[in-house]
């Protein structure tokens, strides 16, 4: 199922009810979970490489007019609320993988709206703070107007820091005791199709 699965919680609950009643095997298309670097970060978290997690800072900044340069960006789904657009729903992958990493969310604080001069009818900036039930705090920045684009994740723990930047596709760990960065994974030329293949393979296993 393409995300967002609905534009209202009422309809989400309806869909969930149908899925449960009909016993339909369902997967939402959040492909970033299947990115090799994101999977490596999850592995490092679970092995407690940096001890207990305290806080997280995630950023996804992009420039919407560059997404499909041969099209009018203002007419695309990402720019229109009626088509499920907006920076929060379109760039939902960050929220999804943090939920995958850390579980249920207890509190949400957010400032979200249209702040740039782009021709949009929806939100183009969201600053979000999450408190997970395990007391981990996450700061998330999403925007449609940033060049050069950035997608990064920094996770701070009691024994160090995990850092990933999509522009280099390197996952690094800072060891607090040794006061030094260590490369845990570096992909020279990442083929984005790989994560979609992994996503499909996972779904095929489920059915």
Regions of interest found by a model, annotated:
Residues 1, 25-27, 57, 78, ...:
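Structural detector of well-ordered beta-strand residues that form the stable sheet scaffold
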Residues 1-33, 48:
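Beta-strand-loop-alpha-helix segment that lines the small-molecule cofactor/substrate pocket
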Residues 5, 32, 59-64, 114, ...:
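Short, flexible active-site-adjacent loop segments at beta-strand->alpha-helix junctions, enriched
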Residues 16, 20, 42-45, 99, ...:
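A structural alpha-helix within SAM-dependent methyltransferase catalytic domains
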Residues 32-119:
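Predominantly a Rossmann-like dinucleotide-binding segment in NAD(P)-dependent oxidoreductases
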Residues 89, 95-170, 197-207:
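Contiguous beta-strand/loop segments that form the cofactor/metal-binding neighborhood of enzyme cores
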Residues 149-153, 173-178, 183-184:
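A short, polar/proline- and glycine-enriched secondary-structure boundary/capping micro-motif
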Residues 187-201:
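Active-site loop of classical SDR/Rossmann-like NAD(P)-dependent oxidoreductases
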